[in-house]
From Swiss-Prot:
It comes from Picrophilus torridus (strain ATCC 700027 / DSM 9790 / JCM 10055 / NBRC 100828 / KAW 2/3). GO terms for biological process: proton motive force-driven plasma membrane ATP synthesis. It is a peripheral membrane protein. It holds the Pfam family ATP-synt_ab. GO terms for cellular component: plasma membrane. This is A-type ATP synthase subunit B.
Length: 460
């Protein structure tokens, strides 16, 4: 059956090819499309029913017609050759080198569709990952094996932040085998050059694998890239015992491609035109993060997405939030004031933070200090709102101090630029900023930590 060439292409719709009178095909099966001039394309079976197979074509459909195409079903799924030689390399969305280096040849070939980790085999994430970003490390801590997305908006600094995290991320244990898989989905050529230059100039390319998909590439490429990136990370994590950080940007472009293909299949649309199965599809990507009991490696995910119209209720951030373990939210207001990284800590959350901080991981005062910073910043923003109504001179003396704290917090703690801060520097800076407030306002920190880490003189 696998040697049969089908000449029964009945329809071509967008990136989809419809083949009739087909027998014994399977979901995700790879297909060869052979044109009469000898040119060959590849595709993947999306659906098969009653002898009809719907094939999603990799790459462009230009030149393909119902009369000049023969289809051969290979009987196998998309398998990626993987090797530790991929470290330091740059590939396109299909895992093909674009850095003028040699192709990857390996006896190890893995199905890119992978599978989610069996819940019984999961090991609880518990190790701190230092990103060098105070608003993340200090207040929304990333834990090894966690999936923590960044919610951004058009024109915000998520690309700059992604590149900074990629070059700075590490664990605190010396000698750790740490690596980065960076997948860029639907980006411009300018953005692609920016990422390449950032990785090369910082020296972080040597322990990274980069996959780039351009906006000019076909939509199918965007569907494949995150799965190829995660397959590479899984090999390095579970076969080579590396702790891998996977950064995927922009997942909104992935979901737009999913919507485009769903429309071409004439499926009934869900919310805002996205397919009803988008939650399930996203979970097959996000749930590949984690640690496996008995294995030394791990996969930590930072998917980045731009919220259309800055709308956090859009299906892309909404469904992502249901699957992942928190979110880092970027603020357009802070961006307008030239604060970078423009992280809105009050809208951000790391649900696994408590498992990666404290005396065994960072420092004993970490939890209480983070809570105090949150509470004090919230009061400072309330004081700012009140001052805009009644004037700053009408505020109480304590409210004026909270207002000053909020300004200092944004300008010194949040706004750190390209400077990398250790967790020790981040925690110490937090105590420095709190010293502008009366010591009796420190309701969230343990009293024993105030004289040990605080910056007050004479207890005031």
């Amino acid at each position: 059956m696998r040697d049969v060439l089908y000449r029964s292409v009945s329809q071509i719709s967008g990136p989809l090819l419809f083949v009739e009178d087909v027998k014994d095909t399977s979901y995700n099966e790879i297909v060869d499309i052979i044109l009469d001039n000898g040119e060959k394309r590849r595709g993947q079976v999306l659906e098969t029913r009653n002898g009809l197979s719907i094939v999603q074509i990799y790459g462009s459909t230009t030149g393909i017609s119902t009369s000049n195409a023969s289809v051969k079903f290979t009987g196998s799924t998309f398998r990626l050759p993987v090797s530790d030689d991929m470290l330091g390399r740059i590939f396109n969305g299909f895992g093909e080198p674009i850095d003028n280096g040699p192709k990857i040849y390996s006896k190890d070939k893995l199905d890119i569709n992978g599978s989610a980790i069996n819940p019984y085999s999961r090991e609880e994430p518990s190790e701190f990952v230092q990103t060098g970003i105070s608003t993340i490390d200090g207040m929304n801590t990333l834990v090894m094996g966690q999936k923590l997305p960044i919610f951004s908006g058009a024109g915000l600094s998520h690309n700059r932040l992604a590149a900074q995290i990629a070059r700075q991320a590490k664990t605190l244990k010396g000698g750790e085998n740490f690596g980065v898989v960076f997948g860029a989905i639907g980006i411009t050529s300018e953005e692609a050059n920016y990422f390449i230059n950032e990785f090369q100039s910082s020296g972080s390319l040597s322990n990274s694998v980069i996959f780039l998909n351009l906006a000019s590439d076909p939509s199918m490429d965007r569907i494949v890239l995150p799965r190829i990136a995660l397959t590479t990370a899984e090999y390095l994590a579970y076969e080579k015992e590396m702790n891998m950080l996977v950064i995927l940007t922009d997942m909104t472009n992935y979901c737009e491609a999913l919507r485009e293909i769903s429309s071409a299949r004439n499926e009934i649309p869900g919310r805002r035109g996205y397919p009803g199965y988008m939650y399930t599809d996203l979970s097959t990507i996000y749930e590949r993060a984690g640690k496996i009991r008995g294995r030394n490696g791990s996969i930590t995910q930072i998917p980045i997405l731009t919220m259309p119209g800055d709308d956090i209720t859009n299906p892309v951030p909404d469904l992502t939030g249901y699957i992942t373990e928190g979110q880092i939210t970027l603020s357009r207001d802070l961006n307008k004031r030239n604060i970078y990284p423009e992280v809105d800590v009050l809208l951000s959350l790391s649900r696994l933070m408590n498992q990666g901080i404290g005396s065994d991981h960072t420092r004993e005062d970490h939890r209480g200090l983070a809570d105090q910073l949150y509470a004090s910043y919230a009061k400072g923003k309330d004081a700012r709102s009140m001052s805009e109504i009644v004037g700053e001179e009408s505020l109480t003396e304590t409210d004026k101090l909270y207002l000053k704290f909020a300004e200092d917090f944004e300008n010194k703690y949040v706004n750190q630029g390209n400077i990398e801060r250790s967790i020790e520097d981040t925690l110490n800076l937090g105590w420095d900023l709190l010293s502008v407030l009366p010591v009796d306002e420190m309701k969230k920190v343990k009293s024993a930590h105030i004289p040990k880490y605080g910056k007050w003189n004479n207890g005031k």
